[in-house]
Amino acid sequence: MPPKPKITRDMIIDAAIKVIRKTGYESINARTVSGELHCSTQPVMYHFSTIDSLKQAAYAQTDQMHTEYLMDIPPDRDPVLGIGLNYIRFAVEEPQLFRFLFQSGYAQESSLLEMIDSEELIPVLAAMQDGTGMSMEKTRQVFLTVALFAHGYASIIANNGLEYDEKLVAGHLEHAWNGAILAAVQEENEHEETV
């Protein structure tokens, strides 16, 4: 029976994420990851036949971390506004991981519209629909508006184009949320009047 590897697949993925946090996803290679682990490149190449497969594994784990971060909402906060603020705060606290998730081309979904149709979002959309009383189509429309707004803010902050001010961001996010709901309700009312 061969000896059990001392450097595991999970250790390598964790090391890759540490490298990304420090210097960005572009710097992931067998040397940088093995340097983080203080080992030769052999364990990295043993567990991952290509660096791209390592990046994909690191992406999946980072995506899971991001989802958990987003869903950690205080009980007294509106869920959608909480998710939006957490999305932006993640870009503030983890700018390199944010860039890896949303600006590297490793996303499984090829567009934001595909993300909105993903199964993982159904509970969030259902909660929004219950809270607003709108159709699922209008709920998706409102979510897309708020998501685009939050993503824009987060991208600007992650790329050092703006200082983070939570009070200001929360106010803008709430205005976007309320405006999107108001526009969706107005559209529904106008549609009902024409029918």
Predicted feature descriptions by range:
Residues 1-7, 188-195:
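N-terminal intrinsically disordered/low-complexity leader segments
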Residues 7, 11-18, 22, 53-72, ...:
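Alpha-helical structural segments
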Residues 11, 15, 19-53, 57:
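Helix-turn-helix
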Residues 29, 99-101, 110, 165-166, ...:
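Short, hydrophobic secondary-structure boundary micro-motifs
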Residues 71-97, 143-146:
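Hydrophobic alpha-helical connector segments
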Residues 100-103, 147-165, 179-190:
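Amphipathic C-terminal alpha-helical segment
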Residues 108-134, 140-144, 171-182:
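Amphipathic alpha-helical packing segments from all-alpha helical-bundle domains
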